[in-house]
Each structure stands twice: as structure tokens, then as C-alpha cells.
Design a protein with these regions (language model features):
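Mid/C-terminal beta-alpha module of Rossmann-like enzyme folds, strongest
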Residues: 195-262, 273-315
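A conserved pocket-lining segment of Rossmann-fold NAD(P)-dependent short-chain dehydrogenase/reductase
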Residues: 163-183, 187, 191-195, 199-202, ...
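Extended, low-polarity transmembrane helix blocks
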Residues: 260-338, 352-431
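N-terminal Rossmann-fold cofactor-binding loop
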Residues: 30-36, 53-54
């Protein structure tokens, strides 16, 4: 049985490649740095949990022993808290190439349509640099460059596409000049298998894409109709400065661990157009990739598809709401602690308890409000908010039960916030 390893095996393309290779009879091992993401992607697969850019040449030589095919589906969109483009796209591939020298294996590189040393984004430039290192080697290699990959799994840009298409009543209109082509995930996975089985010639570089391109707003409309939503009442043109500001804000959040598809790299890539030419693929004997209409016909818009699309923006909205509430409630208390202390002092609570409750609570509010914005601590912060809210409810029953009968309902209003925190805790997961 031939052996294959897939780098980035729990990503959108990596996971599909692993499944397709197994069906084709390969013994497949996936490599990635997150054990939880690997198990969520495929709990029955063989996994090697490693940070790919940290693997040395000597370690690669050990890992490549007996391997027939390496599929490199690892990558990152933009530098951030967890990602380094040069490390993952250039350094890792350079080490892999050095280690594979002289070995009887094939490397299948998953790149991207449009990569170029002169591209407008670091993503495409670093991808091109990695491709060049592989192509300059004497190894047996194939480079596949897909356009926008559509899949049953909502992931990154295609998740945003689903969410934006499902907005109630309105349809955002952005970048009307941007042209987009798509490729079905199964077409890409079949190409990986064909390359792994030696059905494609060595040193082939080809785009994987449908032939037809369309403006991005038209793609949004097509996805909306596919999801089964009524036509929008309003087409809202988003000005370029607003889109730029959203990209900059998403870049900042990227340093807090959020891999938003709204980051400036994705927006610039969309503005440049996501297009390719399938001629090299078809000339090499590849089956023409499915059109967008054929792809969507194979992806029925189920109830869970529509539910995901409608709730896509709910999670970031909930996190932002909780962050603002907890941060500002902490600041307000610190700016006017006397009013907060009066609530306890009039009920004969000892001064030391009052001071600790007011100032300690304010600091806790600030800490939780900022922590929920840091992706690594979001779930823990949501649990902290639930715990502190529960402590407030319990304390009020002991110290100030009259607040429960207050016409403004200060204690009853705690429950919606707790529900929002619980929702964030439940919905958060790794990519």
C-alpha cells in the first residue's frame, strides 16, 4: 500500500485530500499543530501533531522514510498571532525540499491561482516564493493552483460568502469589478489523487478552475438564490473607505488570534480578482472542473446550511456586545465608585467587603471584557462572565433581595447577558 502524508490535513483542502487519498487506497497520515482540530476534522485518521514550520530537515528525513507522496495543503492567509507567512509558505517547503532530495517520492503542492512574485499581497508573494523553491529542485513535483474552493464545509472566505448572501432584507454590493471563478472541492481532491497516483506528468503547474468568471456581486446573488432566501429589498453599496477600514480592523484582530476573512489580504485578493485558466490542467488529461451551477447542484442548501448562514455574524456580534458591556461597566464603576458603594453601604455591608466588591468587581469586568477579545481566551472569558454573573445573583439574594423587585429589573437583566455568554462559549471552536 502506498503511503501519503498531508500537511495541513485538517484544513478545507487538506481534509478533502486525506479522504480522497484513503478512498484511492493510500495509507494517509495528516500533519498539523492542533490536536483538537485534527480530531474534529477526522477522529479516525492517523495524525502527527507538529508545528510544520518548526520541523527541521533531519526530522523531515525521518518522517519521509517510506513515504510515496507528500501533499502540502498547509498555509495561512496573513501574518498574525499564530501565523507567519514566510515560515509556513517558504521555510517549511524549503526544508521539506531539502529533506526529499534523492528520495523516490512526489510532492503535490497546493498553491493558489494568481500567485506571483509581483502580486499585491504577501500571501501570493510568499506562495510564489515557495512554489519557486520547489520548482527549482530536481524532485518529482506537481503544483495545483485552485481558484475559490466551494465545499459542503463552510470555511474562511466561503463562510463569509454564505453569511453575506443570507443577510435579511439587504444585499451588500462591494467590488463590482472583481471577477471570481470557483472550483468544487471534489474536483480539487480528485486532482490531488491523480497527481499522487502518477496520472499527471511531473513538473506540471496548472490552475484548477471552472471556465466562466462572474462579478463578485453576481456570485453573492447566485449563492443567495441557492440558499433559498427571497430577493433582497435593498442593495447596499459599501464605499471603498469603509471596506478598507473593515480590513484594517480585521488585521488588528488578527494579532489577537482571529483569522477573519475580512482581513486586508483577502480584500485585496478579491479586488484583484480570483481567476485562473484551466488549459494546462485539461491539456494534461484532467477532467474539466465543474461549473458553479454544477457545483451548487451537488451541494443542496440544507436547513443547517441556512441556519449557519443566518447565524454567521451572530458570534462576532455577541463577542463585541459582551466586550463593550463588561469594559464600560467596569470603567463606569471606577469613574464613580461612590454610587456603586452606596448600594452596599446602605444595607450595612462592612466597608472592607464593599470596597473589595466594588473595586475588585470593576477590575474583573475590565479583565473579562478585554480577555474575550483575545481568541485564545474567549471561551474562558465567557465562562468567567457566567461565573461572575452567577455570583452577583447569589450575592444579591443574600445582601439585597429587594433589588429583585425593583421596577427597572437590575437583577433580571443579568440573565440575557448570561445567555449571550453561554452562546459564545457554545459556538466558539477552532477552524
Amino acid at each position: 500500500m502506498q503511503k501519503a502524508i498531508v500537511l495541513g490535513g485538517y484544513g478545507l483542502i487538506g481534509a478533502a485530500s486525506m479522504r480522497a487519498l484513503r478512498r484511492a487506497g493510500f495509507a494517509v497520515t495528516g500533519i498539523g499543530r492542533s490536536a483538537s482540530a485534527a480530531l474534529q476534522s477526522d477522529p479516525s485518521a492517523d495524525w502527527l501533531i507538529r508545528d510544520i514550520p518548526a520541523i527541521t530537515v533531519d526530522e523531515w528525513r525521518t518522517l519521509l522514510a517510506g513515504v510515496d507522496v507528500v501533499v502540502n495543503a498547509s498555509g495561512a492567509l496573513q501574518d498574525g498571532a499564530r501565523d507567519d507567512l514566510t515560515a509556513i509558505h517558504v521555510t517549511a517547503l524549503s526544508r521539506l525540499t531539502q529533506a526529499a532530495a534523492g528520495l523516490p517520492l512526489r510532492i503535490v503542492q497546493i498553491s493558489a491561482a494568481g500567485v506571483s512574485p509581483e502580486a499585491s499581497t504577501a500571501f501570493f508573494r510568499s506562495k510564489a516564493q515557495g512554489d519557486a523553491i520547489l520548482c527549482a529542485s530536481a524532485l518529482d513535483w506537481v503544483v495545483l493552483r485552485p481558484t475559490l474552493v466551494l465545499s459542503p464545509d463552510a470555511y474562511g472566505g466561503t463562510a463569509l460568502l454564505r453569511g453575506a448572501s443570507a443577510l435579511p432584507l439587504l444585499m451588500p454590493r462591494i467590488m463590482p469589478e472583481a471577477q471570481v471563478q470557483t472550483v468544487y472541492i471534489d474536483d480539487l481532491a480528485e486532482a490531488v489523487v491523480a497527481a499522487a497516483q502518477g496520472e499527471l506528468p511531473s513538473h506540471l503547474i496548472c490552475d484548477l478552475t471552472e471556465r466562466e468568471a462572474r462579478p463578485f456581486p453576481e456570485l453573492l446573488q447566485i449563492i443567495r438564490r441557492w440558499q433559498g432566501w427571497p430577493a433582497p429589498r435593498l442593495h447596499l453599496r459599501l464605499p471603498t473607505p469603509l471596506i478598507t477600514a473593515l480590513g484594517k480592523a480585521a488585521d488588528i484582530l488578527g494579532h489577537l488570534g482571529w483569522r477573519s476573512p475580512l482581513r486586508s489580504t483577502a480584500l485585496r485578493a478579491l479586488q484583484d480578482g480570483i481567476t485562473g485558466t484551466p488549459d494546462a490542467w485539461e491539456d494534461a488529461g484532467g477532467r474539466p472542473c465543474r461549473s458553479l451551477a454544477q457545483t451548487l447542484a451537488l451541494l443542496p442548501a440544507t436547513r443547517q446550511e441556512r441556519l449557519f448562514a443566518r447565524s454567521y455574524f451572530a458570534l462576532p456580534l455577541a463577542i463585541a456586545t459582551l466586550a463593550l458591556f463588561w469594559i464600560f461597566s467596569g470603567l463606569i464603576t471606577l469613574f464613580d465608585p461612590a454610587r456603586a458603594m452606596a448600594i452596599l453601604s446602605v444595607r450595612d455591608v462592612p466597608n472592607w467587603t464593599t470596597n473589595l466588591s466594588v473595586f475588585g468587581g470593576a477590575v474583573a469586568h475590565l479583565g473579562l471584557g478585554f480577555a474575550i477579545l483575545w481568541r485564545r481566551w474567549t471561551r474562558a472569558a465567557a465562562l468567567g462572565m457566567l461565573a461572575l454573573s452567577g455570583a452577583y445573583l447569589t450575592g444579591s439574594l443574600i445582601v439585597a433581595p429587594d433589588l429583585w423587585a425593583d421596577p427597572l429589573g437590575p437583577m433580571l437583566k443579568v440573565f440575557p447577558g448570561m445567555t449571550l455568554g453561554l452562546m459564545v462559549w457554545l459556538m466558539m471552536e477552532g477552524r
